[in-house]
Structure formats: structure tokens, C-alpha cells
Amino acid sequence: MQTYTYHIVNVFADNHFGGNPLAVFPNADDLTDQQMQAIAQQFNLSETVFLFAPTAKHGVQAVADLRIFTPNYEMPLAGHPTLGAAFVIQQLQNLLNNFVLNTIAKPVEVQVNDSHIELSLTGFEQRISVATHEELAKITGLMADDIANQAYWMNTGTSQLLLNVLSKQKLYDAKINKEQLQTICQKDNELAMLYLWYQDHDDVFVRFFSIENNQVVQD
């Protein structure tokens, strides 16, 4: 039986058992799509990342290609899995502080400074959601006066429904209605992913929700 090494990385953590856990397989070239999906389902973490030898896709010289799986489906791009994968490959290969990873969606530039990692990418698509003001309020469990009049789909590699909440407290008070979120996302022909945000001067506070195994989860 073939064996594979994997690493568990706690992204956005301030202690060993905090943050957002992620499984990273640094040598996944021999795994099939079905095997990767089954492994991600077995780990049952929000995402599992598989690293491959770099290809010439996107026309950029990368140190590795990566693929990201939730327990239910593959994602073309996601932030915290790419951060965790960047940390693992930088440690394993003793890379310089600047390198590129190729995701399914696009190349991602990585900058490493001690234990801090920054990602940068270019290009996005934006469009207005069909959801009415009242429908958006029902998604969040808030009053219509607590949220912006419209929500936008933003795609930098993965589409997410962005909705501005008008106070920090209301951002934390939001309770997501799964059925309403699914209904709106189906109307927009998108996966159920909601990004709530509130800005206070230079600080932006966010909560991100998706649906996994028929349940609302917060990432």
C-alpha cells in the first residue's frame, strides 16, 4: 500500500491548538481526483491541500501546483489553505522568501517574513446579486436597516457573496439562515458562500460562512 506524508497546519493561530486547522499533502502527484476527495472527506477539515510538481499553466514559474478540497468538492482557490500550503513547502524546501504557487484559478505570489506570510494575486470579477434588501436581511437574521441595500458577488478565484453590515455589533449578531442562503445562491447560480464585513476606518472585520454537509459553518 502506498503511504503519503501529510502535515496539519493551524492557520491564523496564536497557539499550537488554535487557528484554522488544515491538512497538507506535500507529494500528491500519484493521487487521483477520487482519492483526494475521499481523503478530504476522511479528514473532515474545512479544507485539505494537495501539492504537485509545478507545471507551466498560467504562464508563471511556480514552485508547486496545488489543489484544494473541502469534504464535498474542490475549490479553485481559497486563502487559508494557500497560506498553510505556502508555509509547509517553504519549510520543506527551504525556499527564498518570495515564490509563486499555482492554484487551479490563478498564480498566487507568496511573501514570507519570519512566521508571517502574505499572499497577493491579480484580477477579479464583480456583479450584483439578484437578492432584494429584504431577502438579504432574512439570510443574516438582521433587520434591513442593519445591512447595505445590495450584495455583490466577488470572484478572485472563488465566488463569494459580499454583504456590508452597518455596525460591528450587528456583524457579530448575525445568525445565518441556511435555507435562505441556499435559495439566493441558487438564484445567482453560485455556491453558498457568504462574506459579511464591516469597516471601521482602516480596520475591516469579517465573518465567512459556507454550507458543508448540509450545515452552515463559519471559517
Segments and roles (model prediction):
Residues 24-27, 51-52, 162-166, 197, ...:
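Short beta-strand-to-turn element immediately C-terminal to the catalytic PLP-Schiff-base lysine
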Residues 44-65, 180-217:
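Conserved phosphate-donor
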Residues 12, 68-76, 210-219:
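A short glycine/serine-rich beta->alpha loop
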Residues 18-24, 80:
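Short, conserved active-site loops that position catalytic residues or coordinate cofactors/metal ions
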Residues 22, 29-36, 41-63, 68, ...:
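Acidic/His- and Gly-rich active-site-bordering loop/insert found
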Residues 38, 60-65, 69-185:
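Acidic, low-complexity central loop/insert segments
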Residues 1-18, 142:
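N-terminal, positively charged, Ser/Thr/Ala/Gly-biased leader segments
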